[in-house]
Amino acid sequence: MRFFDREKELNYLKTYVQLEPNSILFVYGPKSSGKSTVMRRVIKELENSNIVFFYYNLREHATYSKEEFLEVFFEKDKNKVVRNNLILDLKVFKIGIEENYDFSKLSLNDVFKKIKSSINTVIKNGKKPVLIFDELQKLKNIYFNGNKPLLNELFNLFVSLTKMEHLCHVICLTSDTLFIEEIYRNSSLKNASKYYLIDWLRKNSIRNILKEEGFSEEEINYCLNYLSLPYEIVDLIENKKLGLTVEETIKQWINIEKDGLKYLIDTTDLDVEKIYMPYLSLITR
């Protein structure tokens, strides 16, 4: 996907990872607003720097249990820092663990020791480690020894790595607004975390992008009432190349939303007319 106008966000994150670690950074925003794309661009542009990125895209994995989490998080290898060869387009790494290690015997304290040992190895080599978790909330329902919630214990570790010891940056990406609210109310993270919003694209940015792609002023003005997300712009540009008009593409979107609302209405016992009809009238105008 084309990298749309995100210079402000890109510069913020590139600068942030080069500062001394002092807090956990939560990067949040609407689904599909481009958080992962921006973060991956940061990694790409800094791949020849002295920064070592440990990047975990949790949306790609079914991390529903302790064992699955460990298999995603660690790479069995003789080295403590291992190149993640499953991500071909980025120079990113995983925490190494002994090849004969039995994951079923790994305690939470063992996990933390392994993480810290790998981070210290990076630092001893004169480099700066950065831990990145994409869609961190997927770890919410994982418990370790003694039914300890993994996420709460990870946050304690993150505070130690950043605020207390200044060893490593920790960046957590999420599109779950309820999760962000939970984090914000977490007293253990007070004064130990920062928040950065990657929101929908601004209208001026959308206008400039569409102008570059050859859309007329009339088409652009029509689009601005409906566009906000990068994937929508890509869809609009691709459909134009395929011969669909702007109106036809947007009508497709509206019909999809309308069908979704209709399904919701058909499968609920709530007062349909009172709750949903005002919204249906808006999207069918």
Regions found by a protein language model. Name each.
Residues 180-225, 238-248:
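Helix-loop-helix "sensor" segment of P-loop NTPases
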Residues 6, 36, 229-230:
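Short, conserved phosphate/pyrophosphate- and ester-handling motifs at nucleotide-, phospho-/glycolipid
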